[in-house]
Design a protein with these regions (language model features):
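Short phosphate-engaging motifs
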Residues: 62, 153-154
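Short polar/charged helix/loop
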Residues: 150
């Protein structure tokens, strides 16, 4: 079921407003380091065997410099790339990353695994085998609501994650609002981590019942 026209309008307005605020946010590198240090300290991260990182672009929270640290900690690091499923729909594939040298610019100039490596069976990964997913977004709220870029890549992927997989949104504090309009296909986060706070989302509250 698609979002209603009202929800789409509200999402678009919030996306435009917060995109500008995020682009203007000072010291993104320093705040990104603070955010990722919080993530590394989470029990959920420490317990996870396979962690999905996104490969940051533009003004997103920077993640790339923490991938080598995750590998050093013994994590299986998985990264997404744009592909098509058997029906021809655009989806995110997952790749088991061992070194940043395995990446190259891809769709939207976002880094992704080199095409020559993706078909290797040992490099292909199923989202159901991921224990924690770091999720990008444009807008989040304190309940774990999320607005992405509007392409629905992550919405499709997150709906396939295991119920016990941790969904962790990464954002600067300026990206967090009181309430995000959520449609029927949208997925709440377990946690939203900023440079100032760790917010517990509705998905985590539901799992605890």
């Amino acid at each position: 079921m698609a979002d209603s026209a009202g929800v789409r309008t509200l999402k678009g307005e919030l996306r435009n407003w917060i995109s500008k605020a995020r682009a203007a946010e000072p010291d993104k590198d320093g705040k990104s380091r603070a955010i990722l240090e919080r993530v590394l300290a989470l029990p959920a991260f420490r317990d996870a065997r396979a962690v999905q990182f996104y490969l940051d672009t533009g003004s997103e929270v920077r993640t790339r410099s923490f991938i080598p640290r995750a590998l050093e900690l013994g994590k299986k690091v998985v990264v997404p790339y744009c592909t098509r499923d058997e029906r021809g729909e655009e989806v995110l594939g997952l790749f088991a990353l061992e070194d940043l040298d395995e990446l190259e610019p891809g769709a939207f100039r976002i880094l992704e695994p080199k095409a020559a490596l993706r078909e290797r069976p040992a490099k292909q990964w199923d989202v159901r085998d991921v224990d924690l997913i770091l999720v990008p977004g444009v807008v989040f709220d304190r309940r774990g609501g999320r607005i992405g870029h509007g392409w629905a890549y992550y919405d499709k992927l997150l709906r396939l994650a295991r119920p016990d997989c941790w969904l962790v949104g990464l954002a600067y504090e300026c990206q967090v609002v009181d309430e995000v309009p959520m449609g029927p296909q949208d997925v709440y986060m377990d946690l939203v981590v900023t440079e100032q706070n760790v917010y517990e989302g509705l998905r985590l509250a539901t799992r605890r019942r």
